[in-house]
Amino acid sequence: MSAIVDIFAREILDSRGNPTVECDVLLESGVMGRAAVPSGASTGQKEALELRDGDKSRYSGKGVLKAVEHVNNQIAQALIGIDANEQSYIDQIMIELDGTENKGNLGANATLAVSMAVARAAAEDSGLPLYRYLGGAGPMSLPVPMMNVINGGEHANNSLNIQEFMIMPVGAKSFREALRCGAEIFHALKKLCDSKGFPTTVGDEGGFAPNLNSHKEALQLMVEATEAAGYKAGEDVLFALDCASSEFYKDGKYHLEAEGRSYTNAEFAEYLEGLVNEFPIISIEDGMDENDWEGWKLLTEKLGGKVQLVGDDLFVTNPKILAEGIEKGVANALLVKVNQIGTLSETLKAVDLAKRNRYASVMSHRSGETEDSTIADLAVATNCMQIKTGSLSRSDRMAKYNQLLRIEEELAEAADYPSKAAFYQLGK
């Protein structure tokens, strides 16, 4: 009864008004699974290919009708009749059908839409929530959220080079309490920005995007907002950064235009260490350019024992590249973005590899999102213990947070909120 009888994709719009792929998978039992694919703004060079039409007369070339056609034709023909519970087998068929290292023929936006929709259909057919279908019957942790309250870089039109300034409510006793903490700080930050004459418009991920003179000024604003909301920075709340350093790395140097400075990798590692020493920063993502392995090694040696160093553009959720990073001893955490690799099975392999080597995993959204909340279930299913899914505004971000509230409610006493234990790889 769980055989696939129909697969149908369509072009929908994401949170930036750009086209993306949504897929429906219908099973013999009559149940349907639906999934929509996100899209990034700052992307790693080694990410799986997001197939765009290139037809400038439609959506400035960003249409996805080719990817939709691939789903409705080649992929559907290859998968109809197969049991939806055979997730790995289904994903492998698509990988072989594509025949490239980076999903360059079918498009990762085509394969991922199908992969996630198959999992949703199979979960529905089994009478299980997605997180239980993928994660089994064991104990589960709700993730500590990384909440992006100040946006810079490619996510905002302002003076900040560092892309994301985030808060992590580690003092909370539950996810519900953590979400409340984040929301209260977010609203306190809005009042603070208002009082200082900063605009309170938001960036792609729902955070504020004020024009500030330095990154320290952004962090100081976060300290003030945390205290104004009645919490203690460094105790109740820790900070996290996504530098997205590849976006300002040029000719072997890191150029912070807002501060009028350029740094070698050793100097930039010292710059980040200075921020860590001055502010309660527990996590830094993409602190070096994705190809600057020497810089990553320096940063890991300098900060890896006390700060989570997350590889996003560095690892692109690719098990092969992650294995290379583990062997070289760079970073200590993996950012997990399903569309960087293009199938659910490969995503789960990357998380498993990270865990086996004591690297933390952070489940993540993209800056171009939809109402799809699959990553919320994935964060719980994989026991990632951390999730990064934007600020406390924009319904595309709230969809994930609200799904986590529902999951915590369903799990009841079985739900664990890990707090600082989410950073289990530190101090090893």
Swiss-Prot record:
It catalyses: (2R)-2-phosphoglycerate = phosphoenolpyruvate + H2O. Its main location: cytoplasm. Mg(2+) binds at D242, E285, D312. GO terms for biological process: glycolytic process. The gene is eno. Its cofactor is Mg(2+). It holds the Pfam family Enolase_C. (2R)-2-phosphoglycerate binds at Q163, K337, R366, S367, K388. Keywords: Cytoplasm, Glycolysis, Lyase, Magnesium, Metal-binding, Secreted. Belongs to the enolase family. One of its GO terms (molecular function) is magnesium ion binding. Pathway: Carbohydrate degradation; glycolysis; pyruvate from D-glyceraldehyde 3-phosphate: step 4/5. This is Enolase. Coiled coil: none annotated. Its EC number is 4.2.1.11. It comes from the Bacteria. Catalyzes the reversible conversion of 2-phosphoglycerate (2-PG) into phosphoenolpyruvate (PEP). It is essential for the degradation of carbohydrates via glycolysis. Binds a second Mg(2+) ion via substrate during catalysis. The keyword Glycoprotein does not apply. The active site is at E205, K337. It is found in: Cytoplasm; Secreted; Cell surface. GO terms for cellular component: cell surface; extracellular region; phosphopyruvate hydratase complex.
